[in-house]
Amino acid sequence: MFRRPSARSAPAGPSEGAGRLDLAPFRRLLGYTRPYAWRLVLALVASSIGSLLFLAFPVVVGDLFNNAFGAGSTRALTGWAVDLFGGSAGEGIGGTTPADLNAIALVLIAVFALNAATTYVRVYQLGHVGEGVVADLRRELFRHLLGLSTRFFETRPTGEITSRLTSDIATIQAAVSNVLVQLVSQSVSLVGGVVVLFVINARLTLVMLAVLPAVIVAAAVFGRRLRKISTAFQDELAAANARAEEAISGIRVVQSFTAERHEADRYGEAIRTAFASALRRARVRALFVPSVFTGFLMGIGLVLWYGGRLALAGDLPPGDLITFLLLTVTVAGSIGAFTGLYSQVQEAAGASRRVFELLDARSDLPEPARPTALDAVRGEVRFEGVRFRYGDRGDAWVLDGIDLVANPGEVVALVGPSGAGKSTLVTLVPRFFDPVEGRVTLDGVDLRELDPHDLRHHVGVVPQETLLFSGSIAENVRYGRPNASDEEVVAAAVAANADAFVREFPDGYGTLVGERGVKLSGGQRQRIAIARALLKDPRILVLDEATSSLDSESEALVQVALERLMEGRTTFVIAHRLSTVVDADRIVVLDAGRIVQVGRHAELLAEGGLYRDLYEIQFRDVDA
């Protein structure tokens, strides 16, 4: 195969603060509303006006009843309409005329119309703010995730991350779109309603407010319990999503081992656990809201009883009693809304804490404050005393004392038994990991002194399992150079032996490859990956067993393409089939993380040792 061509991150910790309401994440979340401040202010103003109009409704209705039965005079809110449109004094019951009632009814209609207008403004502007904040948060979180190191994703299930991008942010959206404005509007309704109630009858108002302390205590107790259950449910749902993601991404393995029932049982168990938490949350919610409203219904019952006695004594006009009852319902609704807002803040605080855990995660590959610029890259890669181990594997060194130089344009083959450290070694080249000890340099510059994006611009990787994205063939080829012309894309495909099969598709380069490139064969995907690397034009190549899973015909086509790709580039080749590396400039033999042999194919065979053992194992049948 590889014949020489001619001339930031530690994982975030678990959710904390489940025992008390921590508003810090929610306050941080509100910072994302700044770009939409004027829309939020407009929604707040509209909501406040709407709340005042809603308070006006009981007053107008009370005036309507008082005037209809001649039990009282008109208030200032409706008096102007009666003066303007009403009838002559002395007509009707108690001096009230049908025209007076018509005038008050017009005020009632105007209140309804204005309230509808303010509701439209509030709902539309809040929808814009909520969708905008969520879109900004998703974009920021996704960009941040893409900048984290490989180690972060090796310690976090993909499903858990996806859950935080979707369900947690959906919970946040509901809070952003509702909590702040509802807090203001319900405050206006509550304070304004209580003031009007005191104006109507202070003694009756005190009776209504007598039940408030018990309601507030109940809300606090239920809210604390709801927060704990909501946090547990979100964690369990993320775990279920992680299991589903794992099974779906490995569907071929699942089906080949007929493990469908096993995976379904695992997912079902995770869903049952989440479902149990969801039922606990539903049960607490079911107790939460009725308990709060029961207190207010008791207050309304007391108002009816005591207000009826005042009306019988002539101390309270019947219209004022109706106004009082309607305002009591309004105040009760406002306090009930506060309890609902409290539970929503609980859930949003838990969801935002989980999202901000990801946003606060830092890569364990810090970028230099003043990176060294890479000008004309020659491609010399040097490993100096490199030792490396994964954090979750105890004290086992995966690489132990590696000293190796790959000269510009040289093809270096890495061979050895499974677990020898071959793949780990090449992951240090694009700086997916940093060595624990020693250093890796490019043209004499420590990789830790380079901008990672600048470094990776000069490194091309063709893995064994090629990942294509679910776009067109052309989009996948130009993935490393989005601004490449169509002619450059075709030229890269021709050099990669891909142009012929691409043109056989009805849509040519516009053919959609499907998720992960499933519509293409393994050899076709590999050649598209080679075309992608050719178009990127890197100085350094990493070929990680690039043909080990291909049939002979596909391997021959890919081999020719790889030889073109390697021309003039420093290349690291990993291969289990030793026949594919016989023409490499140097073969480096690894065993247990150490270099045990270095040389060309013929030299290593003559020398004996591990290389010849591996060679004889692979070719004993042929030699026989």
Please give the residue ranges for each predicted region:
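Short intracellular "coupling" helices and adjacent cytoplasmic loop segments at the cytosolic face
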Residues: 8-19, 69-73, 131, 139-163, ...
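Juxtamembrane helix-loop junctions of ABC transporter transmembrane domains
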Residues: 14-22, 45-46, 53-69, 107-158, ...
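A short amphipathic helical element positioned immediately N-terminal to and/or at the very start
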Residues: 22-37, 161
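An intracellular "coupling" helix at the cytosolic face of ABC transporter transmembrane type-1 domains
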Residues: 30, 34, 150-151, 167-176, ...
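Transmembrane helices of ABC transporter permease
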Residues: 39-52, 181-232, 303-316, 333
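Transmembrane helix-loop-helix hairpins at lipid-water interfaces of multipass membrane proteins
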Residues: 40-117, 198-203, 301, 305, ...
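Helix-loop-helix
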Residues: 196-210, 280, 284-353, 358-359
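ABC-type nucleotide-binding domain
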Residues: 374-624
